[in-house]
Amino acid sequence: MLPFLLITRVRLSDMNTQDSADLNEACNLSTSDAVLALFQNEPALRLTFGQIASRLDGKHPDLSGAVESLVESGLLYRAAGKRYALPEELGIFSGIIRIRPSGNGFLKAGEERIEIDSRNISGALNGDTVMVRRFESRTHGNMCSGKVESVLERSRKGLSGVVRKAGRGWIIDPVDPSLPRRIPLKSESGSDISEGRIAFALLDYSGRKLRAFAAADIGSSDSPSALVDSVVLDHALPDEFSDNVLDKAAGLASEPWSIDGRIDFRDLYTITIDPVDARDFDDAISIRTVDGLRELHVHIADVALYVTGNSALDTEARLRGTSVYLPDRVIPMLPESLSNGVCSLRPLEDRPTRTVIMKFDEAGERVDFSIVPSVIRSDRRMTYEEAYEYMNGTGSDPELKDLFGILGGLSDDLDRVRDARGTLDLGSSEYRVEFASDGWPSGFRHIVSDSAHRLIENFMIEANRAVADHCMWSNLSVLFRVHDEPVEKSEERLAEQLYSLGVKLPGGRIHNTAVLRRILDGLQDSPLRDLAVEYILRSLQKAVYSPSNTGHFGLALRSYMHFTS
């Protein structure tokens, strides 16, 4: 509806007439569209229902229902005196509220962030779609604040939490820290739930205060698997596939596929490099020298061969959006017969792939590339630890020594090219939680970003860059990964934060990749480096997916997308 309404607004504003009824009839608008077009044509309008009916000359059926629908969806606002207006004209904005564990929240309204004190949340929960009135006065730090006026749509029907006895009744403490504590359980619902058990409760929004009633017992709060189950239920993660989807996947996985139309790379030595606990293998790499150029091959599993547009599998994958990795399980986006089967590049098994072939000169500059359908047979599954042994020269296999000599040399050259281009490297410390055999966390392990990790990162970035360039040059409608330049206000705050760390700042703009790199290089051996990285990250815009290619600030690239995972 929105693109149509935008076009309608432009047309109405270009017409030199006040006869809204004739305009609406000429444009053949629905009742809701006609009402909204009336206000969009004259944004300052404050009309009663009778005045709206008069303006539209009674030409539209069910006007009352249309107006109420617009109010419920947040496109119109019912103000004092039962007058209707566009919300933004009254300083009211709609969007998804985010609530911190402290109870305070915020809402993004365009480029502006409206801070909301816990006293002004008005019963909204984290993730709800709300309408927020922005206050005219600003708080300290020149931040704008506001109050939730109404909840347009609830983000959840229930929650997981620990059941507690409270006097003669029961309460539930949600596992999600952004939700309010001590939510009352309806008295009749606590009889089959005991103290300290984890339960899933359905929420009751009908009263003035939030209440719940227990729907299912999940397990003991002393059970790690029950705690994971509570997270699955709390986020409404679909942990099972329908029989129809499973049957479709199994049928496709067992069907033979043809090599016709694919370039055969099965004789090219190919490896995968993944974490030691990886459950599936999405990408593989090969390299060879052709006419004095290094020819890098990045192979990606050809999932589209099995998952066609608008099929049952495609619909299910869209609903799930991603695979979810939990301590004791994976909830895959596709059934395991695909995700962990024919779409996983297992060693010594033929697999259909899409291959990005990139040629690099002796300096590491890309001179040519192509994208082709292919077939590969991975020769070896390697972990990062194994790959690192060959990167630092301690590996024992002669064939792999030669292979990593070429791979490592190209990766080093790509590092130099990226440095010269002005890429911003914000690599910070990464830690992984380790679990004991009983399922409880046993400690943290520092993940070292060594040359093996860097090699895969470099090669995947180059493949993504090549595919993005191809899509841009071919004018294809795709989602790019864009990262806009920082705004001036965040640069001022960053300068203050870096100064507080004792960093000597150069004159001029600091939101320049070369300047930021020099600052971080100066903190290379300092314990303050991770904090500086955190400050810089907070000052930058978030990288997002967009059909509009505006470039990638952090990578200093004119086009970038996620072709690889």
Feature roles, as predicted:
Residues 1-5:
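Hydrophobic alpha-helical signal peptides and transmembrane signal-/tail-anchor segments
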Residues 54, 195, 206, 224, ...:
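Electropositive polyanion-binding surfaces
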Residues 6-300, 304-349, 381-382, 389:
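Charge-lined substrate channels and their catalytic hotspots, especially those that engage the 3′ end
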